[in-house]
Every structure is written in structure tokens, then in C-alpha cells.
Design a protein with these regions (language model features):
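Absolute N-terminal positional cue centered near the fourth residue
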Residues: 4, 17-23
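N-terminus-centered regions that define maturation/targeting leaders and the start
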Residues: 22-188
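Bacterial N-terminal signal peptides that target proteins for export
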Residues: 1-10
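Bacterial N-terminal signal peptides
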Residues: 9-19
Length: 188
């Protein structure tokens, strides 16, 4: 895809994500691993990534309820809008989560047996598919926004392990029925 088209798709995806408000209804996303709104060490990036953090890099458990009528699948994204990149940092993308799923288990990332059947983890801003935990610069606290988007289609045909976050965001927003948002914080 030419660079100009990629830039256009990325800009459109970001605009669509910002333009759609979080749900004011019954659609809710929660995490038993982060009940106080703080990200514990288990969900922080591991030393192996070379960013200076020393967590377990384990994806958190998430549960949801109240999805809108007509939901046929979900997309989950985890984004740090405070990352010093100018556009934030995407830490996790899971697409094609079946409509009958009610959550994800702790440590589901990277373990197909723990993800709902048909779910696909796509690339993140780490350049690989799967969960990459929080690791803000020292002395800074960042927000980590978990967004579950209910879709009116069964699967995003562009959802492959190689798909970039902006591509998934663009198509998810084009088919979004509603969103549930959970914001947690982490600083070091």
C-alpha cells in the first residue's frame, strides 16, 4: 500500500476512534485484575523488551456485559494516549472475538487455547501480535485505555496477525454498534 494511502487510512481510523463517544448505556468493560484502576506488575512490560520495565507482561482478565442488540463480534484495543510518540501507543489488539464471549482470561494473549475460538491477535506498536504491557518513561504516569467495540459483523476480513492497529481500528469503527471503555493508570 503506498505511504499516502497508509497515512490516510491511519488518520481516518484515529479520527473515527475519537469521534465515537464511549457508551453511556449498559455496555460495560471491567477487569478483576485491575479493580482499583491501577495496572499491577503482572500486566507491566517485561525486561525482555528492553524498555526498562520488569513486569510479568501478562494480559489482564477482562469481562463485559450489556452488549447492544445485533452484536456479532467484538474488537478489543489497549491504547496509551500519553506515550511520547505524538500519536500514542497501541499495546494490544484482539479482533474477531465471538459475540457470545463474555470476557478474556488472565494470560490469554499468546495462548490460542485461552482465547475465544476465532479470535485473532494482531500487531501492536511493538511490531508483533499479542499483549505488550505498560512501560511509561520514569517519573510519568500514563493512561491505558481498554476499548471493547461491539460490531455488527461476524468477523473483520482484514484481521490477521500481520494487520496493523490503524487498519483494524478503521474497519472496526466502520462497523461499530457501541463501545465500552475501561481506563487504568500506571506510572514508575
Amino acid at each position: 500500500m503506498p505511504a499516502r494511502i497508509c497515512s490516510t487510512v491511519a488518520a481516518a481510523a484515529m479520527a473515527a476512534m475519537i469521534a465515537m463517544p464511549a457508551s453511556a448505556g449498559d455496555f460495560r468493560l471491567t477487569s478483576p485484575d485491575m479493580p482499583d484502576g491501577r495496572m499491577p506488575a503482572a500486566q507491566v512490560l517485561s525486561a525482555a523488551y528492553g524498555f526498562g520495565c520488569d513486569g510479568d507482561n501478562r494480559s489482564p482478565a477482562l469481562t463485559w456485559e450489556g452488549a447492544p442488540a445485533g452484536t456479532r463480534s467484538f474488537v478489543l484495543t489497549v491504547h496509551d494516549p500519553d506515550a511520547p510518540t505524538g500519536i500514542g501507543w497501541t499495546h494490544w489488539v484482539v479482533a474477531n472475538i465471538p459475540a457470545d464471549a463474555q470476557g478474556l482470561d488472565t494470560g490469554a494473549s499468546g495462548n490460542a487455547a485461552r482465547l475465544p475460538a476465532g479470535a485473532v491477535e494482531t500487531r501492536t506498536d511493538f511490531g508483533l501480535p499479542g499483549y505488550g504491557g505498560a512501560c511509561p518513561p520514569e517519573g510519568r504516569e500514563h493512561r491505558y485505555v481498554f476499548t471493547l467495540t461491539a460490531l455488527g459483523m461476524e468477523a473483520l476480513p482484514v484481521a490477521t496477525p500481520e494487520a496493523m492497529p490503524a487498519l483494524i481500528g478503521f474497519f472496526a469503527n466502520a462497523h461499530a454498534l457501541d463501545k465500552a471503555v475501561l481506563e487504568v493508570r500506571y506510572g514508575r
